[in-house]
Amino acid sequence: MKKANRSAGSVPKVSGISKPQTVEKSKSENSSSAPTGGKPVKPGAAAALSKTKSNDDLLAGMAGGVNVTNGVKAKKSNCSSAAPSAPAPAMTISESKSKSSTGTSSSAKRSTSAGNKESSSTRERLRERTRLNQSKKLPSVSQGANDVALAKRSRSRTATEGDIRMSKSKSDNQISDKAALEAKVKDLLTLAKTKDVEILHLRNELRDMRAQLGISEDHCEGEDRSEEKETIIAHQPTDVESTLLQLQEQNTAIREELNQLKNENRMLKDRLNALGFSLEQRLDNSEKLFGYQSLSPEITPGNQSDGGGTLTSSVEGSAPGSVEDLLSQDENTLMAHQHSNSMDNLDSECSEVYQPLTSSDDALDAPSSSESEGVPSIERSRKGSSGNASEVSVACLTERIHQMEENQHSTSEELQATLQELADLQQITQELNSENERLGEEKVILMESLCQQSDKLEHFGRQIEYFRSLLDEHHISYVIDEDVKSGRYMELEQRYMDLAENARFEREQLLGVQQHLSNTLKMAEQDNKEAQEMIGALKERSHHMERIIESEQKGKAALAATLEEYKATVASDQIEMNRLKAQLEKEKQKVAELYSIHNSGDKSDIQDLLESVRLDKEKAETLASSLQEDLAHTRNDANRLQDTIAKVEDEYRAFQEEAKKQIEDLNMTLEKLRSELEEKETERSDMKETIFELEDEVEQHRAVKLHDNLIISDLENTVKKLQDQKHDLERENKTLHRRLREESAEWRQFQADLQTAVVIANDIKSEAQEEIGDLKRRLHEAQEKNEKLTKELEEIKSRKQEEERGRVYNYMNAVERDLAALRQGMGLSRRSSTSSEPTPTVKTLIKSFDSASQVPNAAAAAIPRTPLSPSPMKTPPAAAVSPMQRHSISGPVSTSKPLTALSDKRSNYGEIPGQEHLLRTSSTSRPASLPRVPAMESAKTISVSRRSSEEMKRDISASEGASPASLMAMGTTSPQLSLSSSPTASVTPSTRSRIREERKDPLSALAREYGGSKRNALLKWCQKKTEGYQNIDITNFSSSWNDGLAFCALLHTYLPAHIPYQELNSQEKKRNFTLAFQAAESVGIKSTLDINEMARTERPDWQNVMLYVTAIYKYFET
């Protein structure tokens, strides 16, 4: 506000500046109308000419005349008082003024020529007319002054009424503000029309007065005239010198104030650019700004070329706050009165207000009339500084727009990744729902089958009671068998009751768990809907930011066009200034010629010369008044600039606070989303753990049901035996001795068969041990041979390293391809083996249980494969080590192939040592830098395999009393036992679910490690892996990967021998992509990206890039 007060305080100086500025400006304007040839000058003016001190004083003395001076003063007062009453319709008045001024100058020239012709013929008649005109002149001037005073009163009255209306309208609401603004605009328009009529009337009177005064002054030859001239010539030079000094001081003050305003405007603009905001962002409607800027080039030259003073604002006639009110009202006025005739005036006013907003440096650097005459070097320096500042501001704006585009792309990429992950979570939730429904159906089936079995058990119990009653009726003695088996029956009944009670309790627990899971799923679906709504709001926010960026780009183009137009305007002003300077020089030369003619004594035609000089002086004074009005207009513009800058600062503070609030709201929303995602992750993990617990409970129920089926089958056998006993008890005594003899013979035969089976087993064991020893010996020989070959290879490499480098690289690539093919073959075989095994369902298990009840021996022998079978061990990545290490490793890996084949052939006895040996070779050949399988896990598998082999030996040695069929069955079940004794069999359900999830989605573990979404976790992993590499800045999955250096740096951390990173350059995109993709393909990672498309586009598809980086992470880190 201090700046505004200071600039507003400088406004009253306009009235003091007007007269000297008029004199100085008239020098350059009247040079064209001065006569080149002259008549003899009269000797009566010699005394006046001798008193002149300079050419400027000579002009003032030769153009003397009280009446002319008074007329000019009246004209200036009329113009200066008419201007502030109608600032809005400035353009229309200025155009009419320029036209009328040109008409006045032409009519004055014609009247001057006619007066010169008449003066030669009728001098006597004109003397009397001049006396009459002198007497009439004073009333006409007083009448003009009265008109001016009336106009001032009417303007002050209308201005005060407008201020009262404005003060009232500010306290009302927006509707009343709009109505008041419309009423004020109408008043201003009507006032402008009335002022136009008054100005035209005054111009006509002024034209008549000029014509009359010109004729009368041509032939003024009296003593009064000479005395007046002498007094004016005596007093005028001192007045001119004082006014010139005052004008120079005021010009320097104005120049310093403009420099200060320019510096402050630049500082504010630099601060705004540093903060990242442009001045046109605070406009409510950007299209208004573009319309104002398009109109501004037409208005600025018109204001500079105005001949009248309609835009000058004086202190006496202007009401306080009128400029501020217009600045606050111009937008609503534009919206309400687009159909009025004076729309151009309001547009010009708006453009004058908003031009400093768009290019304030250019507006401040535009030279005023006094500066253009006095200091051209300062003008040129200002022009250069304004051009540099505008270029710097445009460059800062371009850089800011580019940065906002990058942030926008990164935000949109992150939003798309979040949407994709939410869709995946929704799909997983649906799968869990379907799995839960399936488990519920299976549970219902299990409960139904359990009820059926309990009904069967009760039915069989009733049958047993019936059979016992029958035995009691026939008095058959079964007391011995009942005594023997009664304890077992009681125990079985007690166990059955306990199992039934436990089944009921577990059923109630399962129902509660199912209800809890259903409620949790409902809550998760509701949270998912809320998250989708939040994502939609974020999408709308991103679209809004895109529209803002487009509007900023349009504003940038409009700024550039306005800058060019301003440059053209300044160039035209410079040309006009040079022309005026040339005219001033010519005028000085003519004045010198007149002075020489006057001194020569030829004074015959001095009155004609004085008349022409007086006309030139009038023109110069009109020009000076116009320049004075331009200066006042410039001050008004400076005041408007100060007010506009203050308003922009207030709006910027408000915008900054609003932006901070929005950022805090967005941060809070982001934290809420993160917390909700974490809660969903925990709920999902809890649901998975609950599902795995339910699977364990289902397996327990299956085992219990199998046991119950066995009990039921025993009871059925018991019933059959009781029925047989009913028919065979009478013949039991007769056949007892014969059965004893047959059983003794069978026992002896069984012992002989058992001995032969033991001999065969010992032979097979000795053969297997001999084969194992042979294989160990061959392995030892192969290792020694491999060591010799490696030593020879090292010697050859030390001697011929430079010659054999190409062959070693070719051999390395061949070995890597073989290993990749071997790895792919193992993966295909693994997948085929896993896919070929059908998963057991509840219905198939129930059918198997029902069939087992009919065939108990077969059910006891068949053991189903558990779902907790271990995954096959991965081979170490051959490409993660150097080529020589891969060459040394490939030997033992290739020699381990016959071991696996032999272990497959002899799965009964040779599998355990073969697997143990394979684990040892793989653990020794794997590099220490990238361990795929932990050492503790391999030790566990080795210890488990040893225990299983020892237990199998003890079972074989202890099974001397078993049959060969049971021995073979035990041999076939031994691999299943060894598989079930793997380390994964003892894993908890939560870790087992985590392992399955990581195999299905490798980024889930990464998201748990780094937190947040999968996309952000993978981005953080890439940043961590490429930390320390030069020219790498990974912020997204599109533009950060467009030169190929990020791929090369990421693969260089694993494959340093394939990528010479120090030799790479960001300009050679195709070479970088080729090296990275070839290195990835050499280890088996298929390239899903096109090299040409990646090298051509600046922003590749982020989803394809993310998939490829995910493949790299999956290969090397999982």
Swiss-Prot record:
GO biological process: actin cytoskeleton organization; adherens junction organization; anterior neural tube closure; cell adhesion; cell division; cell migration; negative regulation of actin filament depolymerization; negative regulation of microtubule depolymerization
InterPro entries: CH_dom, CH_dom_sf, F-actin_Monoox_Mical
Modified sites of kind Phosphoserine: S385, S386, S390, S869, S882, S888
Extent of Polar residues compositional bias: 133-145, 294-304
One protein family per Pfam: CH
GO molecular function, one term: beta-catenin binding
Biased composition (Low complexity): 34-48, 80-90, 99-113, 359-373, 972-992
Annotated Gene Ontology cellular component terms: actin cytoskeleton; cell-cell junction; cytoplasm; filamentous actin; gap junction; microtubule cytoskeleton; microtubule organizing center; spindle
Basic and acidic residues: compositionally biased ranges: 120-131, 158-171, 947-957
Predominant cellular place of this UniProt entry's protein: cytoplasm
Residue ranges of domain Calponin-homology (CH) in the record: 1012-1117
Region (Disordered): 1-50, 75-175, 294-324, 359-391, 916-999
Function: Involved in cytokinesis and spindle organization. May play a role in actin cytoskeleton organization and microtubule stabilization and hence required for proper cell adhesion and migration.
Subunit structure: May interact with both microtubules and actin cytoskeleton.
Protein name per its UniProtKB record: Cytospin-A
